[in-house]
Amino acid sequence: MIELKYLSKTFQMKDGAVKALQNINLTIPDGAIYGIIGMSGAGKSTLVRCINLLERPTEGSVVIDGTAMETLNAAQLRERRRDITMIFQQFNLLMQRTCLKNVCFPMELAGVKKAEAEKRAMELLEMVGDALKAVGMYEFREHAPHLLSGGQKQRIAIARALATNPKVLLCDEATSALDPNTTHSILTLIKDINRKLGITVVVITHQMSVVEEICDSVAILDGGVVVEQGSVQEIFANPKTAAAKRLVAPNGGSAARDLSCFAPDDHVVRVTFNGSSTAKPLVASLAAEKGILVSVLSADTRDLSGQCYGSMLLKLPAELAVAQQAVEYMRSQSGVTVEEVTGI
């Protein structure tokens, strides 16, 4: 288990102190795939570097399996870091080494014999192959990394990260440099590794689609502060903070923030659907049963762990009484949440 307790990080700059992280409290269970999401500058990369103490927290504690990491001496910390590996946006492969030797590298540092290291590296290269294309990465074992595609490089990086049998895999924007299809294949691989090996995965990203596809739970970071956390389904169904709404419903969220796009007497609401309620023809039912017509400004649906979730931004009639009646009707429907954006 990973526990971040009252963690803060301050950088001393020429112009003064910069608070990158403030009072972070998170618990990540063993075997989970946990997302940490935020816009650029939110403090995501600083936070993930604090987990393995590449950055030492200014205040607070990082506790992994009951051990406060900041209390370890240099030798103890090096030993514990073998249990915590990391993959990056730019892969960080050693270009002067072949793919096989890249995977062997952390085992060399750990003193593993060459024959044993190469045997495990070959097994890992097979494991991270692209099942959809029936391509085992061992076929590229003698290739230099510059001959590989971005997705292939990331597969080699994942194999290298698994070389020391880690308990935790940190993914820092690991798919942000990849195209959508390759992103999906890499996320599928990470999910398979999590399921087969039981490795705890921490995913740092600015892409809600990544969290949606792979994560069990998520924390939303904004300005160095965790503003919201919970299950992915919970956050998608009912985002409470402005930061969460920007990430979960970027179209509806941006329209809702720009109040200048609405007239003073406009009545606009955000409607979210949870699970089976997405199949209900809410707008049509509102018109048929109440005779109230509304305009759909934006709409979106997502499938999360087999459950369908959706959201709509609706413009209601100008008459206040009619708009209020529409809100009351929608709120009476099971699995439907209505948030007033403006004008009611």
Regions found by a protein language model. Give the residues of each.
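ABC ATPase "signature
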Residues: 229-230, 238
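ABC family nucleotide-binding domain
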Residues: 1-188, 192-193
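Conserved H-loop
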Residues: 198-204
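C-terminal boundary and immediately downstream tail of ABC-type ATPase nucleotide-binding domains
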Residues: 237-266, 270, 290-293
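A short, surface-exposed alpha-helical micro-motif characterized by mixed small hydrophobic
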Residues: 211-213
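Non-catalytic connector elements of ABC transporters
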Residues: 263-344
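Hydrophobic patch in the ABC ATPase nucleotide-binding domain
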Residues: 112, 137, 199, 244, ...
